[in-house]
Amino acid sequence: MKVSSHEMVPEHEIIPGDEIPFLLEKYGIKIQQFPKLLISDPLVIEVGAKVGDIVKITRKSQTAGETVYFRLVVSNSV
């Protein structure tokens, strides 16, 4: 069973490398300042992300509508 097929799991997608500079500028941060997501996370594995990728997580909520989060994929040794 794919983890992402469960209705409670938010959508995960890899941000293309050429879009990362715009994202960093928009939020006024450095790439190392993103919250971290381990390479061993089941959804990181499922979407095929690699260390250094930025993953966009879109969560749906009855109260908040939709919220977007970004995470930096890091190795397990962090």
Swiss-Prot record:
One GO MF term, please?
DNA binding
Which Gene3D superfamilies does the record cross-reference, listed alphabetically? RPB5-like RNA polymerase subunit (3.90.940.20)
One matching Pfam family is RNA_pol_Rpb5_C
Annotated EC: 2.7.7.6
The Gene Ontology CC terms held by the record are:
cytoplasm; DNA-directed RNA polymerase complex
Q: Which domain of life is it from?
A: Archaea
Q: What is the reaction catalyzed?
A: RNA(n) + a ribonucleoside 5'-triphosphate = RNA(n+1) + diphosphate
Cellular localization per UniProt: Cytoplasm
Q: Which InterPro entries match?
A: Arch_Rpo5/euc_Rpb5, RNA_pol_subH/Rpb5_C, RNA_pol_subH/Rpb5_CS, RPB5-like_sf
Which BP terms from GO are recorded? transcription by RNA polymerase II; transcription elongation by RNA polymerase I; tRNA transcription by RNA polymerase III
Q: Which UniProt keywords apply?
A: Cytoplasm, DNA-directed RNA polymerase, Nucleotidyltransferase, Transcription, Transferase
Family matches, as PROSITE patterns:
RNA_POL_H_23KD (PS01110)
Q: What does the subunit comment say?
A: Part of the RNA polymerase complex.
Question: What is this protein's function per UniProt?
Answer: DNA-dependent RNA polymerase (RNAP) catalyzes the transcription of DNA into RNA using the four ribonucleoside triphosphates as substrates.
Q: What family, per the record?
A: Belongs to the archaeal Rpo5/eukaryotic RPB5 RNA polymerase subunit family.
Q: What is this protein called?
A: DNA-directed RNA polymerase subunit Rpo5
* Protein encoded by which gene: rpo5
